[in-house]
Amino acid sequence: MTSESPTNYDGIDSRIDTVADRVGSVWPLHSFVTANPLSGFEGSPFEDAVAEGERLFGGRGYPRADIFRRAWEDGRIDDDALRTELERRGIERDPETLLEAMETAETKRDDDPDDATAAVDRVLSKWLAAYLDQGQAPWPMPNREEGFYSAWRAVAPYDSDVPGCDDTEDVPATATGAVETVLDAYPRRRWDSIIEHHLAALPGWTGFIKQRADDEFDPWQSEYPITLTEYLGVRLTLVDLLDAPVAPETDADAGDETTAVREAWLSAWEQSYREHLLEDVDDDVTESSHGNGKRPAAQLVFCIDTRSEIIRRHIEQQGPYETHGYAGFFGVPMRHEAYGSDVTTEACPPIVEPEHIIADRPDAHHAEQETAHNRWHGLVSAARKHFKRLKTNPVAAFPFVEGAGSAYGSAMALRTLLPSAVYKLGSTVDEHVPSSHEFCSPTLDRPRMTHEEKVEYAQTAFELMGWTEFARLVVFTGHTSHTTNNPFDSSLQCGACAGNPGGPNARVLAKICNDEAVKDDLRERGVDIPDDTVFVGAEHNTTTDEITLFDGEVPKSHHADVAALRDSLEQARAGAAAERSEALNGADPDKGVSETASRAADWAQTRPEWGLAGNASFVIGPRELTADSDLDGRAFLHSYDWTTDPDGDALELIMLGPLVVTQWINNQYYFATVDNRVYGSGSKVTQNPVGNIGVVQGNGGDLMMGLPLQSLMSDDDSPYHQPLRLTAVIHASVENVTDILREHGHVRRLVDNGWVGNLTVVDPTRDNAAFDYVGGLEWEPSVQQDASSERVAAPAASD
């Protein structure tokens, strides 16, 4: 490859971007977003999309036969449901024969690329890791400010893995020229398939480049830009130099003949789960009261995250407390700038554009706490920088190891053998060193948040949750996670905050709602907040179930309320930690608090918590819908009251936002479980972090796209997460839900195409009768309805 293409195709960049829509975005590990890896195919039926995923990425789309077998033998797949789903597809063989057929089909899988293509992948991955490094490498790749293609072109002659490139003149001068040089040897009708083939060859790196190029706030992209055209330019140049195949094979695989069988088993499993869920929902709708007229001691608003379901139950058991569910970014589209940082992080879902930069700024009357905080953290930071310089300095490294080896060895032994002691030591230090939230408050005017916007954010929150009454204390509770030596720690943070802690958002909404001018305007709009209601921000540590109250500005009149709540939260923590310990391998439920604290500090712990593993449903409705039910931490819960939303406007926002996000989360867990090698990231044991952006398996290769094996499996062969598509249950009229689906085609496609596995409406206008969505805006009575009661005809879709 020595010359530019003679044919200039001006639209090549846009053509590449269009084809790249089929590759899902991949976010950096420090801001991990649990997204659907097949999001580019959501416009297609699920079964077609997974077939495309297998063709492009080599990923399995359905659970293995042994997973189905275990679920069936454990009673999680109902025999009647399985029989119904098989008959619906005209499959007449018995379940055992079908399981054996699936097992046989699985042994035929062969995904190894040819040697030349493997060499291209290896060399390209090496240079992508070097170029995209975000501060991990002590010696960075030169010329990165010129762009990826130019930087690679400058070093390619010195790479012994790249034959036939002795001088920069041996390759085209531009990425576009490199792409066109290769493509011009093929008819234009084949260009898209060739582009698609090479973008899909390393979907992790491609997805990361795609995400980074789209992020206008990314400082690394601003400093060291990279585009998909540059990626393809380098790849196709390597393909040419290494004599690898350019075009994909034309003899497409016929696919898995057992696909219909797998779809039947999966649907039966999902139907069985839905029936079990509706038993709890139906009982609670008919038997629970909607309040007793007494004002609660406090109202706590949690993220809809499945981990909130457990702690909410235990808080409600402690006294007259109400808990509610709301999107964990609390409706504030923002980026957050932490104290002492000059970098902002996204704190809203990827589908929402940030509109504000909220900075933590110190208060003048807390100068003493700020000084103490800065003194301690300054010493720690200086020590870390000093040790890092010693370890990376070619001259000082060996004497440093000789002199400090015993001290490091002792520290390693302590962290390995006594993680609980390390956690207690850290907690003791934290108690004596002020945290930034003790002397900082969120600044709402960078760029300025208008008064109207503040009122809108507060009003939207209360309208979506259907609030008409307020306690003396209202606590907005974001969530975070605490783990040690865990590259995937951000996957345990708040998904609604783009893989970051939700505490800053909770503090912002609390500050907004405490604004007297905001309260006055809310009252004029019908949101009657009592004069004695105080709003507080808080943060739930999902690893230890500890809840931190940001109560520094609470007036003295409410100190007793806060003290009582804090005691109740400690009791709830003990109960929740004990319950969650039952699912943690080797943990003692009788020592739940110490067990969870130990796991948080244990740097050898591969499963500090289960995160959202087990998620299976999204329930939209009042707390009474699921009160007193143990949903086993498997349900996203969003508060909603149909009586305050006659036109369905609030429900529309919930279905457009949280429903879409929970579907993303659910499908990330689903696909990473059914094929962890392709859609997950494999075992943590063999992972290596690369460039502070992600992990690779072994010493190189593609950037892994999803969750690690240990986040999903109890062991290598036994999944903890049950791979089911999302079941959505909505407490509203069928007419309102139907109108929303009709109005918003992208939401309807998620349901019609099977990305949301089941949608059931519990209709309060029809005595809480349940109706299942069957596609095409049509409904039928749920099979779960009591056969002895009078059946309610499925309502026709409104015109």
Swiss-Prot record:
Membrane topology recorded in Swiss-Prot or TrEMBL: Peripheral membrane protein
GO CC entries: plasma membrane
For this UniProt entry, what is the primary localization, expressed as one broad class?
Answer: membrane
Which GO-annotated molecular functions does the record name?
zinc ion binding
Name used for this protein in its record:
Probable inorganic carbon transporter subunit DabA
A single Pfam family, by name? DabA
Q: Which InterPro entries match?
A: DabA (IPR018752)
Organism field: Natronomonas pharaonis (strain ATCC 35678 / DSM 2160 / CIP 103997 / JCM 8858 / NBRC 14720 / NCIMB 2260 / Gabara)
Protein family membership: Belongs to the inorganic carbon transporter (TC 9.A.2) DabA family.
Q: Does the keyword Transport apply?
A: yes
Functional summary from the UniProt entry: Part of an energy-coupled inorganic carbon pump.
Q: Which residues are noted in the entry as Zn(2+)-binding? A: 303, 305, 479, 494
Q: Does the record carry Cell membrane as a key word?
A: yes
Intrachain disulfide bonds: none
The record's subcellular location field reads: Cell membrane
Quaternary organization: Forms a complex with DabB.
Q: Which UniProt keywords apply?
A: Cell membrane, Membrane, Metal-binding, Transport, Zinc
Cofactor(s) demanded: Zn(2+)
Q: Where is this region: Disordered?
A: 574-598
